[in-house]
Amino acid sequence: MKTMTGIITDIHRDVDDVVNLLENAQIIGVWQNHSEIGPRALGNRSIIFDPRMPEAKSLMNTVKKREWFRPFAGTILLEHVHDYFEMLQLKESPWMSFAVKAKPKALKEIPGIIHHDETCRIQTVTEEQNPNYYNLIKKFYEKTGCPVVFNTSFNLGGEALVETLEDAIDTCNRSDINHLYIPEDQEVNVPWHLLKEKYHIERAESD
């Protein structure tokens, strides 16, 4: 574990707070449920952002310290995927295993996750598969009309995916990720006052 820098990171438990932050172009780290294995982050150890912003890719490349040419991905509510992407015979893409062609609606509305060849590596999500992540995106859709979030793995270039809460905080503090979302139903075993004392963390309070 590398030394913490002492940069203040807000930890949010309320999904409405996170939706407001996304709408205001804030980068959010998501830490919940079991850890993730495999090549993709699927909403448990993810960094999310507003995909409507054309500069999203260049911004995230800077934040993650990774090569400019690598494509990014998105997570979309399953019930809306056919409005945005040519799925062909695919009914869903829960493991983010396929790059699919973007429809004109996607090119216009979510340019931040569309690669230069007009494809996107997309993850579909249902409430049954990941209730908290689905609920976050659904609330974002209800507020903005966009049923998609920019989704990339919660790590910096050349590093492993975060595992523990300390890993997540450390990654935030060594980057420009200033907000961490831990859903309200997730147990945090470290007392809040110790997080504040050790890592200079503030727990964001809902209005």
Label each region the model flagged.
Residues 1-207:
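Flexible beta->alpha loop and helix N-cap segments adjacent to enzyme active/binding sites
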